Amino acid sequence: MAHETPDTPGETYDFRAIEAEWSEVWEREQPFRTPDASDSRPRKYILDMFPYPSGDLHMGHAEAFALGDAVARYWRQQGFNVLHPIGWDSFGLPAENAAIKRGVDPREWTYANIETQKQSMKRYGLSFDWERELHTSDPEYYRWNQWLFLKMHEKGLAYRKDSWVNWDPVDQTVLANEQVLPDGTSDRSGAVVVKKKLTQWYLRITDYADRLVDDLNQLEGTWPAKVLSMQRNWIGRSIGAEVDFVVEGRDEPVTVFTTRPDTLHGATFMVVAPDSDLAAELVEGASEEVRESFRGYLERTQRLNEIERSTTDRPKTGIPLGLTAINPVNGERIPVWAADYVLADYGTGAVMAVPAHDQRDLDFARAFDLPVRVVVDTTQPVTGAIRIIPEDGELPDLEEVLPGRTGVALPGEGRLINSGSLNGLSKQPAIKRVIEQLEAEGRGRAAKNYRLRDWLISRQRFWGTPIPIVYDAEGSEIRVPEDQLPVRLPDTEGLDLTPKGKSPLAAATAWSNVPSPVDGSPATRDPDTMDTFMDSSWYWLRFLSPNDATKAFDPADADRWAPIDQYVGGVEHAILHLLYSRFITKVLFDLGYVTFTEPFSALLNQGMVLSGGSKMSKSKGGVDLGSEMDRHGVDAIRLTMAFAGPPEDDIDWEDVSPSGSAKFLARAWRLTGDITSAPEVEWKTGDEALRRVTHRFLAEAPGMLEAFKFNVVIARTMELVNAIRKTIDQGPGGGDAAVREATEVVAVALSLFAPYTAEDMWKRLGREGSVAFAGWRKADRNLLVQTTVTAVVQVDGKVRDKLEVDAKIGADELEALARETAGVRRSTAGRTIDKVIVRAPKIVSITTTPAP
């Protein structure tokens, strides 16, 4: 049965019939294939973050893809050769867990979901180049993951080590730091993450930390400021010094990193992280009593997550290690403690404690009655002349702020005291001097530290890229030769994928036991798979050469298309995917495969789609995209997503009106039935007022679209539709050339947001070809010159009338016209006009008083 939008007279806007017709055309003609390299048009690479195939498309996908498609369609209208591909991020835990639950191969679940999503994408009218479709779980794709790993291994960027890792006790696998949420839980399973010591593979992302921070400057203005800030904070570059403390009874010094080397004279004890390798080394030579105490404390520490350990209001705990360190600036002997508030992966795992000027150190000092020495007088100005306190001088008149008594640290800046030759200096001069002193004596150096840690890529699960390394009988690492790639995943028949804390691939003995590529002797494959963020770190390059069997991508194609001009996706990927992609791009640059260092020139983050203020989910009965499309039509959903507000804002589906969007589309579509002029009509003969509205839209909309003000452009399109309808019903009618011109402009504009409706309008207008390639028409500048303006007429501060007048009208003429309007006559009847202010051509203000 045909669908007719309610409350709309005239022709029936049957969105179901329209969708069926144009879906068939697009499937048959594949109009959005990317032309070959000989196409001389300027190029744009527009990419939406590819989805994980966990089920059908949801409302969040609907928003993101509607926005990304609008961008791609806009640049096609501007005459660009646009690359807009799609694929699936199809490895990962959800597929493996679903396969375990259902007793099937994860391939079966994954590819069934891909087919479901693909059909929904096609129904949604997305202008993808389907010939470039890829799936990261295809051996033809993950072969190049393995190739990239081998290249990094050759350069020393991939390495294996024993370390404490984040362990998900539910999914039974390790997590990168970035996959642990702020509350200490897994971003996948929600389980509380614990620490476990394992031998794992890492990528040296820290070698690129400075470049990753500094190159963010290239992205200012084209990436959201929030994302830039999140990446800077995550990398966490700190500038300071490394200071070497001699520990009595130990040959090697203990090096600590500090951002405040100026406060070295205030260091009264040292603290090491109990779970650090350093702590284990320090207690080796300690007494049995200390070692026993340490073992118990370490066990208690390992039951805590990093959030708990870092909480400032948690009571401080620790144990003395029975060791003494020597402060290099004053020779003072200070005790060495182990305490859980120090984390093993910050700096060297050891800190110099300056309790007077650091709250956590102060809390610890007060808990264990350790010395507190003030070395910064925060009451003194940091500029100007001040009194210098002698080296042996006492802190004057500061009883009430002494941290040891008040329990409140003094973290601010001021002048150095109790610091020998540094006395009287402010922070930066003191830092400079103490670093010079340390370097001269060989006891320290200027240094940087980073919050960022090397990328842990090992995963103890099946459904991922096998690591292309084998081990000989001695355990030596051997790279799988490139001509033996891909190392394919084995069949799951007879293989138990249930998480057991070790890689299920190790149980696949026929797969695991192989001859050594070096000499044919018995060897064993690495049983781990790669973090799936490896898959997505470079997928955008594979789209350039998706069917190339000889290389990951063609560097010539990369030069032609990359970097990506516009990337579209959620802010939830700010740290993980985006940071890793930036890292891998820089690696590929250093290896000579690409000529650029940043993958995404511009980034658009869309907000979330909510329901009643809450995030949607199937378990909570969230809105179903398929049902919404059945009810309102695809175009109405797409238009609603773009019209709801700025893209970065969240959309509450209860606050928007897809039915209203459907009514508007029906109204726009019916315009084509009222047009009687031929396609070749001379537009310049049409109604001038409507042409001015049309060409103002043509002139202003591109800038709005490039600034992602989609909602404003849609509002202006609605205004143009109203102007057309008014011209048809109250003006020269549907045969006027300007009506055809304006309606064609509406069709082109709607092609960005409502492609089915726009294509049907274009056909009904008698135009050949697809509206998607019709081109954005140039505005006639002569029609942008304002010849008339709306003058507002006020009486006693209230608007009583409006006049459409010549832009060059004089004050006297404008006043005379205003006095004759019906609104002014009514408002001044029985009153005396005292004063008239005229600001031609826009305002007339009349002031009255009651008549005598």
Curated annotation (Swiss-Prot):
Among SUPFAM superfamilies, the record links this protein to: Anticodon-binding domain of a subclass of class I aminoacyl-tRNA synthetases, Nucleotidylyl transferase, ValRS/IleRS/LeuRS editing domain
| One term of GO molecular function | aminoacyl-tRNA deacylase activity
Record's superkingdom?
Bacteria
Which enzyme type, at the first EC level?
ligase
Motif stretch ('KMSKS' region): 615-619
Tell me the keywords, alphabetical order: Aminoacyl-tRNA synthetase, ATP-binding, Cytoplasm, Ligase, Nucleotide-binding, Protein biosynthesis
Task: Report disulfide bridges, numbered on this chain.
Answer: none
GO BP: any one term: leucyl-tRNA aminoacylation
Q: Per UniProt, what is the name of the gene that codes for the protein in this document?
A: leuS
Q: Where is this motif: 'HIGH' region?
A: 51-61
Q: Which residues cross the membrane?
A: none
Q: What is this protein called?
A: Leucine--tRNA ligase
